[in-house]
């Protein structure tokens, strides 16, 4: 027989009500905890760091799938051709844990492309600032670690502007005050080079492959590589030059053809002397190419491949 509390409520009914209340509180607590854990996992998934790499050895060769949709321009002129690559001219720059590359394009012709890679060049992301009306790429470099900057012709008037990105290429902004610090080929007169100290005349009417750093200016004219020496242009490699790079110490690397190399030869100019230092065997010297210093090593972008030399 059930015991009754004063007021007419059975004792076991009270305990049942308390049990139900405790159970409900427990369920609510568990639900809140589960939601908190789910929210933490979702937040963490958006903050996964991008992979980094080192230049300790050869960069992986991109597979056919990894290069789909990426620029792989090349020219196939007759042997001995020394013409400028034009819209197919290439640029390569090394940042902190990232590679940047680009193709020149041209106003009223093929558009340029700018890409970045976090895996030594195996895969690339297109970060071309098309929304800025980019029409031609004239220079590409890195600064402040992984960030990139460039000189590019923008807008309907194809005016050269200095642009920078601090967001891995997601956003590019013009920096008008930086343009005067750059060295680039004059868009109104290809035979002239614009420098921070004024314009200088190139050794030919159609120079290309221009690279400048720390006051050192090098370029390619009629297939030969030159460096500015006082008021004159001194030849570095006679014929077959394909790409140049200048490091912070003023050394110049030249990619070119040579009888000693079944591919693309690499020479280094320093302290007034040019020496052949490496050979990228199997690389096609007729392909458009770009060269970049990476510490003590060199990176060569030729065909679909970025390889490490030295």
Q: What are the language-model segments listed below?
A:
Residues 117-118, 163-166, 227-228, 265-269, ...:
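Conserved Ser/Thr-centered positions that define the repeating blades of beta-propeller domains
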Residues 4-45:
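Hydrophobic single-pass membrane-targeting/anchoring helices
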Residues 290-310:
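Blade-level signature of beta-propeller repeat domains, shared across WD40, Kelch, NHL, RCC1
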Residues 99, 104-109, 153-158, 224-226, ...:
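Short glycine/acidic-enriched loop and turn motifs that connect beta-strands
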Residues 220-286:
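Intrinsically disordered, low-complexity segments enriched in Gly and acidic/Ser/Thr residues
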